[in-house]
Amino acid sequence: MASGAGGSWGRSPPQSAVPTPWVTFLQPLSWAVPPAPPQPGRVKEDLLELMMLQNAQMHQLLLSRLVAGALQPRPASPCPQVYLEVPQEEPEEEEEEMDVREKGPLVFHHHYLPYLMPSPGALLPWPAPFFPTPACQPYLQDVPRIQHCPASREREVRAVPPPPPPSATGTVGADVPPASDYYDAESLL
């Protein structure tokens, strides 16, 4: 910041004088000590020190905001007041509203989907009476039910095959016949 050619702040410099531009030279300083290479055990200590510094700064910031908030005066009411401008209604609209009010209050019905309830015995930590639901009311009302219809007479009804022979279960011995002797080929059809 030059004060001009004459050394006075109030006057403008004469037109013949050319202002000298500022020049910045960046030169490495040879006498500066290079930083020591980080030692293996020192990195953790430096990181811990940095974290403690950040923690102290955050603590200081929070406390300063808390003090600033406590010192500032607060409004009389805890919440801001909101004023709405309501347009003036015409008498015809007021009569319509009165007719609606005379008919009765509005009723809103809320419909909730049923949900499965877990067994209350496993969730309750204290002894509580367990009241099972009545047999006439299922837990879920709109759950699809399985209906068993009698088989049509067109299909031939087969009997359920017998259980596997002992030889199929690995219990073959001298007194147990093999599976081929146990089953009769005609009984399976």
UniProtKB/Swiss-Prot annotation:
It comes from the Eukaryota. The gene is PRR29. Residues 152-189 are annotated as: Disordered. This is Proline-rich protein 29. Pfam families: DUF4587. It comes from Homo sapiens. InterPro entries: DUF4587 (IPR027904), PRR29-like (IPR038915).
